[in-house]
Regions:
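Conserved N-terminal phosphate-binding loop of PLP-dependent enzymes in the Aspartate aminotransferase
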Residues: 1-297
Length: 297
């Protein structure tokens, strides 16, 4: 999102829970502790992880009530990409959503990164998490390169919104953009790209995990479907983030013909989010490029 309202809500790129960064979001916004099992306060292997992380929603709801705002909604990127693509505890988002609804808020699922089959097991990230949202935002893959964004909601919510705002868009619902979006849906179904995602993503994750045996700089490999994170550290025992090495490897991979992204509060996590047509050969090329780059460190 590029509007002032969305920017005011986004903690992307900063640790929003750190005291010196809390003012980076608007006063009517509260951020939650990311359900991050690699370097978060509660880590993989501990019991009750979903409950422990979800409890932070109670704190946020109470603070909003005390400040006189109340709770309007939970807005969440269901891939948690900006948090470094953590392995989210099973049931976490469902528990948070229940707390928000009990406080009178709605659930807004941002599916720009995870939607259109990228979980592999489901078409949408909210389905993977077992949550039914009130509003869904969609972009990027929806048009396969054609500029298109979509907001999906219920007739009741849309009617109330239009009655109170009178929002009008000159380009909203233009036929060419809609045709592009429908064509993307047809291809996903006809070519069974969710099955391709399930197969290739597991193959790629296996290859990336095998690199850990050869390269000490890889601290963790995680993710689900075609959203995979590889965390780079300077020391596996202390889990010290190493953004400098990550950037060097990323740029060397680019020289080798493979593009990746960068995520996480420390800027040390590879974001690997390939297109749905990504093949096993493509995955092998990515793993080989990362291996070669790390051998050159």
């Amino acid at each position: 999102g590029i509007t002032e309202a969305i920017v005011a809500m986004s903690p992307e790129g900063v640790d929003a829970m750190a005291p010196d960064n809390r003012e980076r979001v608007a006063p009517h916004v509260r951020t939650l502790i990311a359900p991050e099992l690699y370097r978060g306060p509660w880590r993989k292997g501990e019991k009750g992880l979903a409950d422990k992380y979800a409890a932070d929603a109670d704190r946020a709801i109470d603070e909003l009530d005390e400040a006189g705002y109340g709770t309007a909604s939970l807005m969440v990127d269901t891939s948690f990409c900006s948090n470094g693509i953590p392995d989210v505890p099973k049931g976490y988002l469902k528990k948070v959503a229940a707390k928000v609804r009990a406080a009178g808020g709605m659930i807004i699922a941002d599916e720009v990164q995870y939607g259109f089959g990228r979980p592999g097991t489901h078409m949408w990230g909210y389905e993977y998490h077992g949550v039914r949202p009130d509003i869904v935002t969609i972009g990027k893959p929806v048009g396969d390169g054609f500029p298109l964004g979509v907001v999906v909601t219920t007739p009741a919510i849309l009617h109330a919104f239009m009655e109170q705002t009178g929002l009008f868009s000159t380009f909203g619902g233009n036929p060419m953009a809609c045709a592009a979006g429908l064509a993307v849906l047809d291809v996903i179904e006809r070519e069974d790209l969710l099955a391709n995602c399930r197969d290739v993503s597991q193959h790629m994750k296996t290859g990336l995990t095998e690199l850990m045996a050869r390269h000490e700089c890889i601290g963790d490999v995680r993710g689900h479907g075609f959203v995979t994170g590889v965390e780079i550290v300077s020391n596996r025992d202390t889990r010290e983030p190493d953004a400098k090495t990550m950037v060097w490897v990323m740029n060397r991979m680019r020289e080798l013909g493979v593009l990746t992204g960068r995520e996480g509060h420390h800027g040390n996590v590879f974001k690997i989010r390939p297109p749905m047509v990504f093949s096993r050969d493509n995955a092998d090329a990515l793993v080989t490029a990362m291996d070669q780059a790390m051998r050159e460190l």
